[in-house]
Amino acid sequence: MISQNNKGYALALFEIANEELKLEQYFQEVKKLNEIINENEDLVKLLSSKEIQLEKKLKILENIFTNHFTVNINNFLKLIITNNLFIYIKSILKIFLDIASKKLNISYGKIYSSKKLDEKIISNLEKFYSDKLSKKVEMLNLIDTTLIKGIRIEIENTIHENSIKNNIKELQKSILEKEQ
């Protein structure tokens, strides 16, 4: 029931964005909102609290978000708060972003490396895979201390690996096959 509600709110926002021909704008705003929400767990708790009056929650929302988001995004957030669903905001935003990214032909990938990669390298990898997959690819760099050197890239459930760790695995596999 709750997940259907979440999907319903996400779909409603998606339909409004589509009708207004502003899906890209809404997508960027919701991405920014999602980052803010994920970085401020206390805000989610505050705006989800049943002990704080609705008027106070709406005032908090207004003070924080009014100058940063369009009227429709702010109204959407007010509706979520008014219906006591802010505890599910992360799920609602994720569903919207998933639906919108499919419509906008955007894929997400993860670059695992032993150390933080330079933004230029990430940008070059995004461009390379965007061209290869014929869609926009946005990547997040994650640190994996088990990698000795090299990178592992995951996009759309496909793994592209060029690392010493993987090379050692392949060598072991090859040796074992030759022994049989």
Curated annotation (Swiss-Prot):
Per the UniProt entry, the disulfide pairs are none
One cellular component GO annotation, for this chain's record?
Answer: plasma membrane
Tell whether Oxidoreductase is among the UniProt keywords. Answer: no
The membrane-topology field of this record reads: Peripheral membrane protein
Q: By its UniProt entry, which Gene3D superfamilies does this protein fall under? A: N-terminal domain of the delta subunit of the F1F0-ATP synthase
Extract the Pfam families matched here: OSCP
InterPro entries named among the record's database cross-references = ATP_synth_OSCP/delta_N_sf, ATPase_OSCP/dsu
Family to which this protein belongs: Belongs to the ATPase delta chain family.
List the HAMAP family hit by this protein, alphabetically.
ATP_synth_delta_bact
* Organism domain of life: Bacteria
Mind listing the UniProt keywords for this protein, alphabetically? ATP synthesis, Cell membrane, CF(1), Hydrogen ion transport, Ion transport, Membrane, Transport
Its function, per the record, reads: F(1)F(0) ATP synthase produces ATP from ADP in the presence of a proton or sodium gradient. F-type ATPases consist of two structural domains, F(1) containing the extramembraneous catalytic core and F(0) containing the membrane proton channel, linked together by a central stalk and a peripheral stalk. During catalysis, ATP synthesis in the catalytic domain of F(1) is coupled via a rotary mechanism of the central stalk subunits to proton translocation. This protein is part of the stalk that links CF(0) to CF(1). It either transmits conformational changes from CF(0) to CF(1) or is implicated in proton conduction.
The name of this protein is ATP synthase subunit delta
- Please state where this protein is localized: Cell membrane
Tell me how this protein assembles: F-type ATPases have 2 components, F(1) - the catalytic core - and F(0) - the membrane proton channel. F(1) has five subunits: alpha(3), beta(3), gamma(1), delta(1), epsilon(1). F(0) has three main subunits: a(1), b(2) and c(10-14). The alpha and beta chains form an alternating ring which encloses part of the gamma chain. F(1) is attached to F(0) by a central stalk formed by the gamma and epsilon chains, while a peripheral stalk is formed by the delta and b chains.
Report whether Chaperone shows up as a keyword of the record. no
Write out the GO MF terms: proton-transporting ATP synthase activity, rotational mechanism
